[in-house]
């Protein structure tokens, strides 16, 4: 049975815990397929990588669908789907990673650690992009796309291998089980 999870939230520890909880509850209730309708402005990198690896570990088919905007670290959560689609008006935003450091006092070692962490996160992010899109773009292409704050439309997303098709979301009337994560 298909279960549909509606994820319309920023990526953070709380919303990813909600996603994990809903996925496990759906599987415990007999779900053989999870459809995740997504719209997210992105958010916390650690939470995004956690969600990606969690979804890839599930013993059921995961279909991700971009309802509107999938941005920043939400891109890799979207790429965890074994089937990936999006509405004709959807978009994907790629941009350089950043951390907010307002009011924080740190030493040189901590700044170096943060810089190394951001560099490593970028490499992991590009590893996922390359793997999930079957290498349709090179590492250098992905780095340019990210560094230039690029928006990919539905058509571009299909060309780049981010999704297989642009189509409207489908909500089965019955039987169906629905879950929500909102932020």
Language-model features: where?
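N-terminal organellar transit peptides
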Residues: 1-73, 79-183
